[in-house]
Amino acid sequence: MRGVGLRALSPEEEQAFESQFSTIWEGMMALERKPEWEGIISRLRSDVCFPLISSHIPVGIKRILISSHPPTPAKLKSLAWSNTTDAGVFTWWTEVGGKQESGEKTVYVYVGSASNHPGGLIFRKRYMLSRSAEPHDEALKRKIKDLGLSPKGQFGTLFTVPFENSFEGDVLDVRAFSILTRLLLMIWLGAVGGELKSKTKDLVPWKLGKIQYIGLATDNPLLTDINKSDEPKRSGKGRVKEGTKGRVKRRV
């Protein structure tokens, strides 16, 4: 999947992708959420969001999602990384640290989003497990430690969207779409754990017993502050006021 040209989805494949997208999206709308998400979600129906999100998901990722079986750990490990300042959704996989006596190591997968401007995916990768990580990343760091996982995992990209020239230049919309797409894809891949897993298991297109990896994400993104930066605390940047419109100038 690295740098290989892929043919477009057939009409049948596109229909299958849209159908599963709609099913998961409707299920997402039933999840608990903070009040500030109400106004955003009220105008983001599935038929409105589908073309916007679909156009930013690579064909190769779509084929993984509409497959009759979940991706193998090897397939997840092959996902390419986009070293970009665009917003996006990514995977981070890891295994138990050290040697394992027998058999293949269990793969653990975290699906996260990068929605801070400026910075995007490249900054998210740099700071996710840093000492100055945000609270939701601190929870991930604790889980890595408790499970004895290696912190030296590998990143792959599922979705990218530019902060500029997207959604009429509204940075808040880019941020919201990135967070919503993260929730969509972590459910779709069955890469969730904790209470959220029991709430979303019926939305996963494959039998959970067929999935050969363990999801590390346990948070419901709709309970996060849409205005809160995912940039490290020491930067003091990244907070976006709701209702902010217009083109965002790049910093130089």
Where do the model's predicted regions map?
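Boundary/linker segments flanking structured domains
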Residues: 1-108, 113-252
